[in-house]
Amino acid sequence: MALPRLRVNASNEERLVHPNHMVYRKMEMLVNQMLDAEAGVPIKTVKSFLSKVPSVFTGQDLIGWIMKNLEMTDLSDALHLAHLIASHGYLFQIDDHVLTVKNDGTFYRFQTPYFWPSNCWDPENTDYAVYLCKRTMQNKAHLELEDFEAENLAKLQKMFSRKWEFVFMQAEAQYKVDKKRDRQERQILDSQERAFWDVHRPVPGCVNTTEVDFRKLSRSGRPKYSSGGHAALAASTSGIGCTQYSQSVAAAHASLPSTSNGSATSPRKNDQEPSTSSGGESPSTSSAAAGTATTSAPSTSTPPVTTITATINAGSFRNNYYTRPGLRRCTQVQDTLKLEIVQLNSRLSKNVLRTSKVVENYLAYYEQRRVFDPLLTPPGSQADPFQSQPNPWINDTVDFWQHDKITGDIQTRRLKLWEDSFEELLADSLGRETLQKFLDKEYSGENLRFWWEVQKLRKCSSRMVPVMVTEIYNEFIDTNAATSPVNVDCKVMEVTEDNLKNPNRWSFDEAADHIYCLMKNDSYQRFLRSEIYKDLVLQSRKKVSLNCSFSIFAS
């Protein structure tokens, strides 16, 4: 059988992982629970009039176990789960090629862990041809080829016409080995091999669960290797030699049906790997080796089963889920999901506004600022509520710019901007002067002076930074000798002193932000209610009304 391709220099940590390994891992955990000798599915040997059927269980027992242990109340859910497990080849019906489960007395058998899909089996057509050719040599009714198998055999014989003699010789050699096995052992291994091919070469009309979407295969990062890098290289890189490796797998496979429950009674502790050979070994070849190991006593060259098991656990079985390259991809997926969870939680913690509310806020902001936009409301037009001078860019007069200097009054538009925003007040030089006069009367003028000096510090030249830092500290921050100390709390003062250990243009940012918040929340509101601001508004309104009367009289 063609085994999974490995890198030429592959190590134990670089083995391939099937793109569906997470699904297989969950199924195998469930199957291992079913294989438990005490709490698992009851496996028994059924006696008939002339023969025995070893290591089987009924569909009723399986469905009952699923509903009991998985706490399912719906029979259809239990049947669906059983169908999924059977379709992936973890259990099979002993006398039918269709991998389904019925809730009746039909007998089923668990697949040996050696044939589990998590081992990344990729069987070739030559292996399938050997298997079908071997089936034709066995004169038994239950081993006769089905119609679709006979058609497949004819196609394969035509495909491999040049090397069909080699295929026939392999099938004949495997058939001779099978004849030396015990009857019950041969019966179990034949059914397991048939179930393996029912999964990888299913009956026409059934779903092939081993097919992987090429896009999914590419996303999983699984490389595509040439036929030169065979799985035998893995044995050379591991701690077990090639011969000992194949013997250990064969012995482990042969020990499975020797128990009372057959091959299904040994839970899968780790991911087994297929046996290796230079030309590719089929499942029947490994079964033949298993039969030889079972029927004959171990020789001096073959280590005991316990030693083999320990060696496998220390070597080949070390490549479990946690040490394979799939861990990197799984870790990336987990990190992505964790990041998404953090982002979603942050969204839940934020104040969420409805779209209609956001639109209302935008419309309100537009209506508030529209009168100040000269493109939407041209100055001097009928829509201008402030009756300002005409726009100097489209008229032959510059009165709009010279109005305050000529008349000595402040325009209503300018005062309205101060009222709408504290930022607009500070951005206007005349607004800062007016606010400074008010703060001086309130005995808190040092706050605005300190904030403005910090703004100048941020934009000054580099050679002036140490000088300005010293001046600002001596005038506003020094607790012992400051001429105009500002009111900052202890935490801000500690941060500022730490920043002054390495003076730069951002040393006073925390203190400036603190003072800015104080002025915006307290001083600005008192300024709008002060007599200074009210007098300015009253004078501007009188000027506007006088201009309107003159314009009406002139018209």
Swiss-Prot record:
InterPro entries: DEP_dom, G-protein_gamma-like_dom, GGL_sf, RGS, RGS6/7/9/11, RGS6/7/9/11_DHEX_sf, RGS_DHEX, RGS_Egl-10. Disulfide bonds: none annotated. Disruption phenotype: Impaired egg laying; the few laid eggs are at the post comma stage. Impaired locomotion. Its main location: other. Residues 274-307 have a biased composition (Low complexity). Residues 256-267 have a biased composition (Polar residues). CDD domains: DEP_RGS7-like, GGL, RGS_R7-like. GO terms for cellular component: cytoplasm; dendrite; neuron projection. GO terms for molecular function: GTPase activator activity. It is found in: Cell projection, Dendrite. PROSITE patterns: DEP (PS50186), G_PROTEIN_GAMMA (PS50058), RGS (PS50132). Expressed in nerve ring and ventral nerve cord. Residues 37-112 form the DEP domain. Residues 330-395 form the G protein gamma domain. Gene3D superfamilies: 1.10.1240.60, Regulator of G-protein Signalling 4, domain 2, Winged helix-like DNA-binding domain superfamily/Winged helix DNA-binding domain. GO terms for biological process: feeding behavior; G protein-coupled dopamine receptor signaling pathway; G protein-coupled receptor signaling pathway; intracellular signal transduction; negative regulation of signal transduction; positive regulation of locomotion; regulation of egg-laying behavior; regulation of G protein-coupled receptor signaling pathway. Residues 421-537 form the RGS domain. Interacts with gpb-1 and gpb-2. Involved in egg-laying and locomotion. May regulate G protein goa-1 signaling. Plays a role in regulating dopamine-mediated locomotion behavior. This is Regulator of G-protein signaling egl-10. It comes from Caenorhabditis elegans.
